[in-house]
From Swiss-Prot:
<dbReference type="GO" id="GO:0043047">
    <property type="term" value="F:single-stranded telomeric DNA binding"/>
</dbReference>
<dbReference type="InterPro" id="IPR012340">
    <property type="entry name" value="NA-bd_OB-fold"/>
</dbReference>
<protein>
    <recommendedName>
        <fullName>CST complex subunit STN1</fullName>
    </recommendedName>
</protein>
<dbReference type="GO" id="GO:0005634">
    <property type="term" value="C:nucleus"/>
</dbReference>
<dbReference type="InterPro" id="IPR014647">
    <property type="entry name" value="Stn1"/>
</dbReference>
<dbReference type="GO" id="GO:0042162">
    <property type="term" value="F:telomeric DNA binding"/>
</dbReference>
<dbReference type="GO" id="GO:0016233">
    <property type="term" value="P:telomere capping"/>
</dbReference>
<feature type="region of interest" description="Winged helix-turn-helix (wHTH) 2">
    <location>
        <begin position="298"/>
        <end position="370"/>
    </location>
</feature>
<dbReference type="GO" id="GO:1990879">
    <property type="term" value="C:CST complex"/>
</dbReference>
<dbReference type="InterPro" id="IPR015253">
    <property type="entry name" value="CST_STN1_C"/>
</dbReference>
<dbReference type="GO" id="GO:0010833">
    <property type="term" value="P:telomere maintenance via telomere lengthening"/>
</dbReference>
<dbReference type="InterPro" id="IPR018856">
    <property type="entry name" value="Stn1_N"/>
</dbReference>
<dbReference type="GO" id="GO:0000723">
    <property type="term" value="P:telomere maintenance"/>
</dbReference>
<comment type="similarity">
    <text>Belongs to the STN1 family.</text>
</comment>
<dbReference type="GO" id="GO:0000781">
    <property type="term" value="C:chromosome, telomeric region"/>
</dbReference>
<dbReference type="Pfam" id="PF09170">
    <property type="entry name" value="STN1_2"/>
</dbReference>
<keyword id="KW-0158">Chromosome</keyword>
């Protein structure tokens, strides 16, 4: 019981799991790692990889074993890193129809034959043999002490020249490097840790946390514009920026902030505002004051001008059907509004306009206005 309670203390609280995108996705993991996942002590059926909560996975491999039961197939799947058992439920056969008194019409016969062909195709792709390539998406379960996958979706992959397998081999290392191998850090936990245990964050982490808190302050108070010096007078933000940080020799920040000098505080606020700029949440206008920042979501004039640009451009013959591409809107906005308008700021404005139903995304990166 003591080991179980200590394990729960090391885990991220279950209420915060939804903040990690990996929790809601089908994690593309190597089978070796699926077999080595640590099970949660809070919720059964949830596992952890490097702090990421995982409940469903996506695998691709070769069938090396087949067992058929009345209700399901049991496939042993090998992806060259390990072997795991996959329970793939059989699809119900609804082709049997009750005896009908009326003779079916030619159209009904045609639909019935097409449906039968479709069901035969599905059945062929659902029943696999040893040596076939299978893709499985499902939940991780324990059965008689062995870990297995209960499939929600599975199918045979036609891959005669190994294109799909090669693409998977190239995709997984990048996903691991960018997502799975990056520890999950909840902003809420970071804030609690920083406030309760001063000095537990490095400079970069403290800057990111300050940026998040500044964003919350701007949204809650509906701030339209601000100077950096004004943010530095907000007590909650200032107390956070005053936290001591862990020194990092490798990043060249040794001795940066042992004391809470005004210059150090000014620097961390400047970097936090820069992060907000990179996200497109705040921006500066050409020809304006150097230290004056505008909040993107509160600049209604900018929203109206971007909306008008999309309306006018969508009336032109080459944009009537499909709408305007994001880069075309950006070029027009830079030409007529501000040469320094950034892509993140425009993306924020387009998202706000779409949320208000002023514009619609017709296809990826294309927008039309009403």
């Amino acid at each position: 019981m003591e080991s179980n309670s200590s394990q729960c203390e090391d885990e991220t609280p279950s209420l915060l799991w939804g903040l990690d995108p990996v929790f809601l996705a089908f994690a593309k993991l190597y089978i070796r790692d699926i077999l080595d996942l640590k099970e949660s002590g809070q919720v059964q059926g949830v596992f952890f990889y490097n702090g990421h909560p995982i409940k469903q996975v996506d695998i691709l491999g070769t069938v090396i074993g087949v067992r058929e039961k009345d209700a399901f197939y049991s496939y042993g799947v090998d992806d060259s890193t390990g072997v795991i058992n996959c329970i793939c439920w059989k699809r119900l056969n609804n082709t049997k129809s009750s005896s009908a008194t009326a003779t079916p019409s030619a159209r009904e016969l045609s639909l019935t034959s097409q449906l039968k062909k479709l069901q035969e195709t599905i059945a062929q792709r659902a029943k696999l043999e040893i040596g076939d390539i299978i893709r499985v998406r499902g939940h991780i379960r324990m059965f008689r002490g062995e870990r297995e996958i209960h499939a929600t979706t599975y199918y045979k992959v036609d891959d005669p020249v190994c294109n799909v397998q090669i693409a998977r081999m190239l995709e997984l290392p990048a996903i691991y490097r960018k997502v799975y191998d990056q520890p999950f850090h909840s902003p809420a936990l970071k804030e609690d840790e920083a406030l309760s245990n001063p000095g537990t964050l490095d400079l970069d982490s403290l800057t990111c946390l300050l940026s998040e808190k500044a964003k919350e302050f701007l949204v809650e108070n509906r701030v339209q514009s601000f100077y950096q010096q004004e943010l530095e007078t907000v007590e909650s933000l200032l107390s956070l920026a005053n936290q001591p940080v862990i020194h990092s020799a490798c990043s060249g920040q040794m001795g940066f902030k042992n004391d809470t000098t005004s210059r150090a505080i000014h620097s961390i606020f400047r970097n936090a505002v820069k992060l907000l700029q990179e996200e497109g949440l705040v921006f500066q206008k050409d020809g304006g004051f150097d230290n004056l920042f505008y909040v993107t979501r509160e600049d209604k004039e900018l929203h109206r001008k971007i909306h008008r640009i999309i309306q006018e451009e969508c009336q032109k013959p080459n944009h009537v059907e499909k709408g305007c591409h994001f880069l075309h809107i950006l070029a027009c906005a830079r030409l007529s509004l501000s040469p320094g308008l950034s892509e993140p700021v425009l993306q924020q404005v387009l998202q706000l306009l779409e949320d208000q139903s002023d514009i619609v995304s017709t296809t990826e990166k294309y927008y039309t206005a009403f």
